[in-house]
Structures are given as C-alpha cells and as structure tokens.
C-alpha cells in the first residue's frame, strides 16, 4: 500500500508558477507518522487501535486536508506588519485553542523536508502539553489516546489561527502537528522554546519532552523573533545521561548521535522506532523516561552546572 498517495500532501495543491519557499539542497526527506508505521511497523496494529483513536484520527485527517485546501485562500491586499492589538489577539486565540508556549523565528530552507515546500518564511511555533499522568502510563491505551488528542488539538488550532490572521488581513499557512513540511523540533529550538535532546525531541523548561508541536507560517515582517537560545547546555547534559538510550525498547536511539558533513543531526533509527510505536500503543517510553519529564528543569540545570564547575 502506498500511503503517500492516500495521505494529504502539499505537493498536490502547490502552484509551482507562484512564489514559494523551496527546501535546501541538503534538506532531509520527511515522513509522516502513518508513512513510517506502514513502511517499517504494523498497520494492522494501528487498525486495532481505531476504536480507541478513531475520533482523533478522523479529525486529524480532516484538519490536515483543510490546511492544504486553504493554501491560497489569502487576503487580496495582505498587510506586512502586524499591529500590537492583532498580535495580542493572536496569542490570546492560540492559548484559548490549547497552545501552552509560543515562539517566533525565520524558517531555514534546510529545515524544510526535501519532498516538500512552504509559502512563507516566518513562523509562529506552538507547543501543547501531553498530560504527564497519561504519558506516565506509556505504553498504554491512555497514553496513545493522549498522543493523538494533542495531534488533533494542534491540527485544529493552526487552521483556526490561519483563518484569524486571514480575517485581519495577513497571509498565513497552517502547519499541522500530524503531517507538516518542516522539522518542527529544529524550528522550535531556533525559536528559543527549548533544545533538542539525544532522543531527537524538543526538551522544554515547562514540560520537558512531553509536548507536541505545530506551526503557522506567514510573511508578517515584525513578529517578535527569538534572537537567542538559553537551553544550549542540554546536549552536554544528555551525553552524561543516556537514560533514553538505555530505556528505549527498540534500541532506536543512537548513543552517538549521527552528525552529517553539513552539521545536521540524526538521533534515532526510524525503522527500529516505528515497530514499537505501531505495535505497542504509540510506545512513548523515551518521553516518560527522560529525566526532564521526571524532574524540574531548573533543578537539573543548576545541578549540572554546579557539577561542571567542581
């Protein structure tokens, strides 16, 4: 079964005779969760989960299709600068739709997947909490349902935000959590929201790695872009920890992160990861075993910094 033909895809809607942002020559190929499950895991295991996840799966698919169908529904005379009131209203709406933290940055072309593209270079990045009580039980039906709940909430949120920006006269493109055209952890890291850990997920001060990410792209020129990242100590800490490496049931997380000639990283073997993800309720062991999930961010940072000085 060729899942790429069944899944909504931006390339089916992109108008190549109009301006868009293409991936860089060194961009990596991107896969959606369903594609990885079908390519390396067990679609039948996921099919058995439909009674538990059906509502969210259908909702995610609907919102994903909606994001692509609305690509070119934009204002006739779009504004390039956002007013203070509109920015406040934008962030208030995002939080009312479930977003916990918000960051802004410029998309690097190398972050765009090689088999994709986007319309606008500036990005509003959103995260949402996967509830710790449910993720702590992973792998379980409860944790699996929470994973897909957050996918659905974010997919719906970015479409609502896109519609809001359009209604105020700004260009916008929704970047759903399930699917998407860009490496979201890299984008969120660049936006100063956290830092990627050894497991390849974004670690945030608020919730550790127990989050999902989504994006809204725009050409608004005066967004409050992040200029720095105060979380760059995390990779050094991860080198002393390796808990996720040791706890991964598939042995999918590389103890020595693969670093390519262009400086990009590969943290996990997707083939190995997809097997327990598809067969064992979305797995998520790497999230619940991460020390940033279990402990307070500031306490971990202060203890690590003190140890480095001693």
Residue ranges and their predicted role:
Residues 1-106, 114-119, 288, 292-310:
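Iron-sulfur (Fe-S) cluster-binding modules
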């Amino acid at each position: 079964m060729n899942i790429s033909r069944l899944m909504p895809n931006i390339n089916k809607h992109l108008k190549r005779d109009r301006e868009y942002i293409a991936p860089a020559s060194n961009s990596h190929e991107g896969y959606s969760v369903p594609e990885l499950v079908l390519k390396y895991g067990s679609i039948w295991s996921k099919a058995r989960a439909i009674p538990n996840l059906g509502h969210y799966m259908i909702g995610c698919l609907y919102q994903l299709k909606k994001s692509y169908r609305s690509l070119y529904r934009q204002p006739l005379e779009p504004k390039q600068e956002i007013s203070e009131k509109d920015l406040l209203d934008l962030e208030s709406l995002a939080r009312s739709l479930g977003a916990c933290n918000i960051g802004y940055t410029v998309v690097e072309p190398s972050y765009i997947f090689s088999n994709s593209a986007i319309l606008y270079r500036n990005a509003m990045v959103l995260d949402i909490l996967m509830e710790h009580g449910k993720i702590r039980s992973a792998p379980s039906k409860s944790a699996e349902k929470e994973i897909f709940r957050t996918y659905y909430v974010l997919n719906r949120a970015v479409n609502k935000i896109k519609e809001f920006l359009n209604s105020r006269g700004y260009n916008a493109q929704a970047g759903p959590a399930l699917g998407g055209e860009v490496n979201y952890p890299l984008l969120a890291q660049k936006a100063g929201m956290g830092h990627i850990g050894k497991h390849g997920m974004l670690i945030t001060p608020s919730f550790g790695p127990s989050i999902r990410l989504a994006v809204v792209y725009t050409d608004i020129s005066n967004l409050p872009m992040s200029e720095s990242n105060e979380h760059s100590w995390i990779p050094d800490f991860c080198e002393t920890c390796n808990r996720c490496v040791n706890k991964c049931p598939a042995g999918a997380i590389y103890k020595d992160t693969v670093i390519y000639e262009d400086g990009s990283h590969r943290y996990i073997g997707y083939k190995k990861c997809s097997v327990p993800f598809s067969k064992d309720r979305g797995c998520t062991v790497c999230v619940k075993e991460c020390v940033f999930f279990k402990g307070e961010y500031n306490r971990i940072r202060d203890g690590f910094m003190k140890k480095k000085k001693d």
